[in-house]
Amino acid sequence: MTEITAPKSAVTAEQFADEIREQLKYTQGVTVEQAKPADVYVAASAAVRRHLVDSWMKTQADMVNGNTKAVGYLSAEFLMGKQLENALLNAGLTDQFDKAVEALGFDAQEVIDAEYEPGLGNGGLGRLAACFIDSLASLGVPAFGYGIQYKYGIFKQEFDENGKQIETPDYWLANEEPWGHIDYNRDQKVSFGGEVVEENGKKVWKPAWSVRAVPVDYMVPGYASGRVNTLRLWTAKSYDEFDLLTFNKSEYLDAVKPQVEAENISKILYPEDSTPQGKALRLEQQYFFVSASIHDAIRVFYPGQDKPDLTTFPDKINFQLNDTHPVIGIPELMRVLMDEYGYDWDTAWTITNKTFNYTCHTLLPEALEVWPSKLIGELLPRHLEIIEKINDQFEAELKAKGVAEEIIKDMAIYTGDSVRMAYLATYGGSHVNGVAELHSQLLKDVTLKNFSDVYPDKFTNVTNGVTPRRFIKLANPRLSDLITEGLGTDKWLSDLELLKGLIPLADDDEFVKKFAAVKQANKVDFSNFAKRKYGFDIDPNTMINTMVKRLHEYKRQALKILSVIADYADIKSGKVSADDIMPRTIVFAAKAAPGYYLAKQTIQLINNVARVINNDPDVKGKLNVYFPWNYNIELAMNLIPATDLDEQISQAGKEASGTGNMKFALNGALTVGTLDGANVEIRERVGAENFFLFGMTEPEVSALYAKGYDTKGLSREYYEKDPQLKAAIDMVADGTFSDGDKDTYKDLVNDWLNKDYFMTLADFRAYMDIQAQIEETYRDPMKWSRMAVLNVANSGYFSSDRSIEDYLERIWHTGPLK
């Protein structure tokens, strides 16, 4: 008999239907007969919030009144996905919702689909933050997520008639948004500019302007924990929204100028920073949300106290810096402690150092933020002074430890011209963690080697994870039911290591066939979704081969599309008959940063390869490429369960971790990948025989760099000696995918042949060889499905619950509320 332990609310379906009906009447102002699915979505969301409020308030009260240290997760991104279905699951209301909505005459999925996905993140960083706050609540750990409520998100991606990416505003707040509760009574004042003066022997910052940070609270219900934490996102408002005198002079635009300037801070995620104004806006954003969050935490944990004892602040809350975006919080807390509460430098430093911890998410030098000191001085003059003093203290400490002058110079936080935020975070906090074992080792050996040599105890690893509630239970209900059937319990949703119980079932033909049937049904569902949403005609009887992630050269979408072009070239030249090709559908999805030229060129190329190949009768439908636009959580939740083969082909030593690889493995996709990021740990756990490995290792990559690969044009040698590679690049260069225009992709081709920094060409042959092995394996359906079962069974380690437990043990030293 199957044991079901999922949360189940005491409310009945009839009661829930009455609550929805009541919300429609009193909140929406419509009857059930007048209502549309969007109205029912808003009403149902309001009803769910009512069921969460008591637990939310109790969680906050227990957090403030108890002795359990809280976590403040500071992140520029929270890629939450749709809220209603997740809240229903975690609150135990899914069945009641389905029956109630049906009784009211609506389709439950249509109501779920009426929700517009929040535009609060870009990629893995934001999705990780969302998984983590879900796990914190599910484990009963008191926590705040702190960030910004971006009015227009990152951007909405569209493609023009030439396949180019077009960025348009993401109007995710244009319709009624029932989950965020704005609280004007708990606003914070955030100031910028001005000067620092000395008054009575003390430094006093006299800002030039201020904005109002208003919190918008989102409930974060835990799964089966009875706890509801808070995601607090700040929106920027002006203190002088409207100048009536100016307006009455018919100077209408000037009358609202202060409002526009203030609200720009929370307009979009990652504004283009190629201009001085864009750089300034990014820094304003970062300071805006960390300043508001620090002041908010003091208000929360020391309510009504004018002179709180902030020496206990690190015992109340630990701030986790999710990448470098919130690092300006270190000098901000120093400023608050010294200038607002009168603490001396040493006491303030001790408090600050104990309060902050830093997660580094990259190995790419350009992603380790460096701010011009001139800009910091203009926007945050007091903070620049504090940073200079931190650097002086740091250098003195290094000298006392006997560190060589040359190394001290290399480790400088403040160089005179710039401020290195990763270095400030490393010195200013208690711990630094990487996000996969290989990444953490490379941080210690390469990226932050000098810091690791001097402060070895600061460094640790916490491998990333994903929440199984959203990415298995919600995304893949068929697989979820099969897992529960196979294990005889649903406890795996809160203890994912229980998936190991599926290992013996990989030898059970009946179970493996059921598993394959689940995958095929998911492929049919995705085919229908893609037709409905994008107009694509995807054949669910082909292999679904997926590469979805942010578009960046190091992730090497170029390698994947070159392999597709090479296969196409073989068909066109007659070397291979389309009749002999294993049918394959390649799905790309990715956004490129608006100013990232080569990434946008790659998107254009993929779209045009798709246009040409998909319409060429010589291919006979055996090779198809699709690029659904505007990749988001909804698309991921439809595509991941349908995927047979997942591409994780970044250059070794460049990907910090990745979480897409975990989601795919947990949903029964096999992985082709390099020894990079969390691929290393996935392969170790699922077994080398169940992972398609190719490509150079990180030491081999380093050795090739040492030979001058990217500076001496060595990539051209690979092009010249590999006929398949040459044919593929020549097709791009000769205009095959640009209506005969040889200039369209000349910059991309030039980069491949003369630089190729991320060694796409160097790994091409190994990649083509592994693809041949993949095809051979896929032609044996039972073997493939057994391998897929073992991937699921051995991927339980990659739960975000386990990640949070590691943070609790290694970094935060706290636990669930009592």
Where are the model-predicted features located?
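A conserved ligand/cofactor-binding region detector
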Residues: 1-818
